[in-house]
A protein has these predicted regions:
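Single conserved hydrophobic/aromatic residue that forms the stacking wall/gate
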Residues: 170-180
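Basic, glycine/lysine-rich polyanion-binding surfaces/domains
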Residues: 1-172
Length: 180
């Protein structure tokens, strides 16, 4: 869960983020874009993965090492009229990454949801279940392989990890484990 995570919401959330970052914001709910925040000299301040989670609500992910820098910087530029609300989700939201040539096969074992390429395109996010845990699966990762970031309430972290590890052993030609 080594990411900084926050939600920006409110009637002017889109307008605010459009001002704050370079690159286009995702327009459709469930879409993701990689956006860069620029400093006053036009250099890159930080990089954010931004997902539109609802109308007037965006979920932002950045490097965990930049938590204070990024969150303080966002709040510095927020309008003071209450039209934009910042919510730090770093401690309440966990993230596990599943990536590699058998990532889809593993995800199909731990979830009843459809992880096919046709149903789950690059730079999209969907609410799914892993075991009994609610997960926002984001089809994005930066390791050069097929994969998903699994964003979830932190109280489900151990369950999701255990489910992935239990089923990981059964992604080859071995017999399926009935617990997966």
């Amino acid at each position: 869960t080594a990411f900084a995570k926050c939600r920006i919401r409110g009637p002017k959330a889109e307008e605010f983020l459009d001002y704050l970052v370079a690159n286009k914001l995702p327009k459709k709910i469930g879409r993701i874009n990689l956006c860069h925040a620029l400093n006053t000299k036009g250099g890159v301040h930080s990089e954010f993965t931004i997902m539109k989670e609802a109308e007037n609500s965006y979920y932002l992910v950045s490097a965990g090492a930049n938590l204070r820098l990024d969150h303080d910087w966002i709040q510095k530029w927020m309008p003071t009229d209450g039209s934009v609300i910042f919510e730090d989700l770093t401690n309440s939201t966990g993230v596990l990454v599943v990536a590699g040539p058998k990532a889809r096969e593993l995800m199909q074992k731990v979830s009843t949801d459809d992880f096919s390429n046709e149903n789950f395109k690059w730079l999209t996010a969907k609410n799914v279940n892993v075991g009994y845990a609610p997960v926002n699966a984001m089809r994005v990762n930066f390791v050069g392989e097929l994969g998903w970031e699994l964003h979830h309430p932190i109280e489900y972290q151990n369950h999701i990890f255990d489910k992935l590890m239990d089923c990981l052993l059964y992604t080859s030609d071995a017999a399926d484990d009935p617990t997966c």
